[in-house]
Amino acid sequence: MTAEYKNWQEEFVDINFTDQRLKSRFFKIIDAFAASPGKSTWAATGSRSSAKAAYRFFSNSEISKDELLDSISRATVEKIKCADAEWILAVQDTTAVGFGDRKAIQGMGYYCSTEQRGMLVHSCIAVTDQGIPLGIIYQETNTREKPRDDSQTKEQKRSRPIEEKENFRWLDSMRETLLRMPADIPILTVCDREGDFYEFFSEAADLKADFLIRIVQNRMVDDGKKIFHELRSSPVAGSMVVRMSRNPKEHIPSRNIKMDYHCKKVTIYRPQRRKEKHLREKLELTAIYVHECGKKGTEWFLLTTVTVKSEKEIEKLVQCYAHRWKIERFHFILKSGGKIEKNQAREYGRLSFLTLLYSVIAMQ
């Protein structure tokens, strides 16, 4: 057995194949895909017979995507148990995977407001509070039956039940994370601005789940003022240097940024349009405002359930949010290295399965 073969086995815990030949074939396929990322199944496997064997494997109902995900998640839990970390960050994000106008993909719908075919891939990965990626906790894919409807007003969109909105996947991912992770492991869910909705905050409180979210909504807080104004006008609590990861999309290299931060306890309230009884009327949270020193540049407004008692604890939370860029890097590698958008599979379910498979490779 090669070292590579053994290592890939460690990424799938208790994967259940009744036929050991299928298990052997599975790891050979993983090994081939990892050695030739972005190539077609035919090119990666190296021969006509190997390619046919791979196609037969993907057509076999022996192992489902859900079973594969459970196995991957269990492997991540094993790594988490060995990690030296105060918190494990459960970092969520969504990326769009487009297939252009390839209408021949069975079951594939739309992913944006145009006629372009594609799917949305929502992932949750485990990262230590020191920024070390550990593995995939959860992943789901969705494709729209129709192109996104941009004709609705903001108020129409806001009034829809959360279960009918696409950002429901952020709630779903948090629930799945808590189900999959051992209860004695401290989890901090980290989200970008798409996770900024009251239903998420309220359910996290019900589940006693900690979160750290960059907010975009300038909410009213307990003293009748807007949260952004309150944070900007509050005294500077301290300064710190934040390591910003490189942004390959905008060709920005990694760099250190000196930032000031402000911190304030706030109370936010259930939106008036939300009448659901299960939503909490108000929530007491910690708000943090971080911005570049002396100039207009990078700034973050953060909300968290974590109570802070010192500057050191504030700085730790800011660094934890900075680690959110690990998932953007992960999605970038999945799409640019794995070239999943160029995969020639002709069925949505298979592309979803392959995306999860390539996600494990991308994490490495």
Language model features by range: what are they?
Residues 1-105, 113-120, 125-364:
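Single, function-defining residue in the core of a domain
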